[in-house]
Amino acid sequence: MRLGRLGAAGVVAVVVVPLGASAAGAQTPITPEQCAAFVAAKQISGGAVRDCLQLAAIDASDLTITGDVDLRALGTVDHPIRCQRCHLEGGLRIADVTFTRAIDFDGVLIDGSIDARGATFQAPVLARAEPSTPSGVTGTADFSLATFADAVTFDDLSFGQSANFDGARFESSVSFQGAQFGADAQFERVAVEGFFVLSGGTVQQETSMRDGVFHGTVDLESRNFRGGLNAAGADFTGRTNLSLATFGASGGPDGLVLDGASFADVDASGATFASHASVRLVHATALNLNQASALAGLDLQGTQVDGPASFDGAELQGALDLQKFAASQIVLDIGALGNVASGPARRSILSKIERTARDAGDIQLANDARFRLLQVDGSNSAFPKREVDWVFYEQLGGYLVRPLRPLRALFVLILIGTAARYVVDWHRERTGQLAVVGNGVGAMGRRVRVGHEITGFLGRFSRALIASLRPKPNITSPVGETTVEPYVIAGLRLFEYVASKLLIVVFFLCLGNYNATLRDVLGSVKL
């Protein structure tokens, strides 16, 4: 009678205890038919998921999974998993588990955290968001030291808290295109054999790619790194695309840190560095910062670029540190150099621009760099050398690279000569040395007077022009004169002649430096 009661209690225990649970330590086996029934009912427990994966694949959609899914006891999962638009009402614990078949979690929503530390995925992993349903992980996602042997995609997925991929190995490609990160994103010491895509979307806190190794193309285009990006010491052997990305926030810490990193081609065209950007001791094959905006300073100290470094159209606010920066060719908006951190760095980069531009045949850029370089030298001089440099070398001579400067000075000299001839003629009229044309009467007289003034101006202007251009001075010697006036006039005319000839010579020298053909002709002349 006592054994009967115990037997009945055992039957009740089997009925009451859910599938996959144990009674008095005994494991109740689950059948494939029961797994199929759970899938058809669109609801299954986390424990049942574990038990079903020991028997067969899971192929479901719009499935609700209650509780945590803990697969650590399985060690290896040899069946594929397809669970599209599924909702896991708990965490996913798969640390150190090996998955030999593909995983399709498109549209999945995990209301908990993922612990995938040390997990191995030997087949593709798909976890893309779908616009029709909320998708992502509300808790933390820890894939540190995980290995992905095939392609992985987390496109448009939402990570509510920290996402950690430190030390992970991606033996193929990985994509986070459009993924949203509510906290930080950690990719320190990762190794990626294929392409790495992190374009679009926003990372609210710091993104770290320090000491990572990226063998393929890295695409960070249009990504908003609100907490900044730190890729110090990383190695990028493929092309790196930072175009249109935003790094940091106004008033925040460093928005971009690439110190000691190694790159192939770097394209940061149109990028915005909202806070300070540190790109020190970087080595790159080429650097493109065209149309980029550095709003809080850019530090390129010690960076070496084997090919061209282009800053064309860049907006550079704050300090621009280019000390020991080197590139085979530099394309930089000369006007942006007012923000260079130090005088020696400013002079060094201008010299580099002039030399590389002249070697490339870009005479205009070379002349602009030369002019600005001499401006910098002149402004750093002491009084009165600084003032003399500004008047004679910069404004009158154009530093021999701006032909309009001496031409403008020559025109002003001719106007001064015209005005001086007005004064001399007026003085001679007063002293009776020059005949005065009588004034007319009435309207006819006014018309005659206006015509006389125009004719007088043109006559004096032409005399000043001829005096400036004639090959010989044609100055009457004042020797023997008893008054001072002839000596003064002769001295002024001699000054006019000498100054005009000097300005003409300087103009042709500037023109020779300004025009590539004339420069070659002048350079071929041997004295």
Language-model segment annotations:
Residues 1-26:
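Secretory targeting and sorting signals
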Residues 401-425, 501:
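Selective detector of the "anchor" transmembrane alpha-helix that sits immediately C-terminal
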Residues 383-406, 434-499, 506, 510, ...:
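Pore-loop/selectivity-filter region of tetrameric P-loop cation channels
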